[in-house]
């Protein structure tokens, strides 16, 4: 069985020279969340270790402040949770 090779990805936070990730900025955080609001791993997002840890802390803070749900019911899963209706 062959391993799936992932393409080389670059950290978008490093390239954009972002100095701080705010937990209230959901547009920035949505790129590292799956459709079920789970935190995606570094190998899929391309984030560096430093920025992945900062994003995780920001997402956990946003969950604590009820800006992002902890869990999503299977029946309520949508394609993109951040689309405006």
Swiss-Prot record:
Assigned keywords, A-Z: Ribonucleoprotein, Ribosomal protein, RNA-binding, rRNA-binding
Entry keyword Ribonucleoprotein: yes
Alphabetized SUPFAM superfamilies for the sequence: Ribosomal protein S18
A Pfam family per the record: Ribosomal_S18
GO molecular function: small ribosomal subunit rRNA binding; structural constituent of ribosome
GO cellular component: cytosolic small ribosomal subunit
Domain of life: Bacteria
GO biological process terms held by the UniProt record: translation
Gene3D superfamilies found in the cross-reference section: Ribosomal protein S18
UniProt family annotation: Belongs to the bacterial ribosomal protein bS18 family.
Function: Binds as a heterodimer with protein bS6 to the central domain of the 16S rRNA, where it helps stabilize the platform of the 30S subunit.
NCBIfam families on file: S18 (TIGR00165)
Subunit structure: Part of the 30S ribosomal subunit. Forms a tight heterodimer with protein bS6.
UniProt protein name: Small ribosomal subunit protein bS18
Species assigned in the record: Helicobacter pylori (strain G27)
């Amino acid at each position: 069985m062959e391993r799936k090779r992932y393409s080389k990805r670059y950290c978008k936070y490093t390239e954009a020279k972002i100095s701080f990730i705010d937990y209230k900025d959901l547009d920035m955080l949505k790129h590292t969340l799956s459709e079920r609001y789970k935190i995606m791993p570094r190998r899929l997002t391309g984030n560096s270790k430093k920025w992945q840890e900062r994003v995780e802390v920001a997402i956990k803070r946003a969950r604590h402040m009820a800006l992002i749900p902890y869990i999503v019911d299977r029946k309520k899963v949508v394609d993109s949770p951040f689309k405006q209706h």
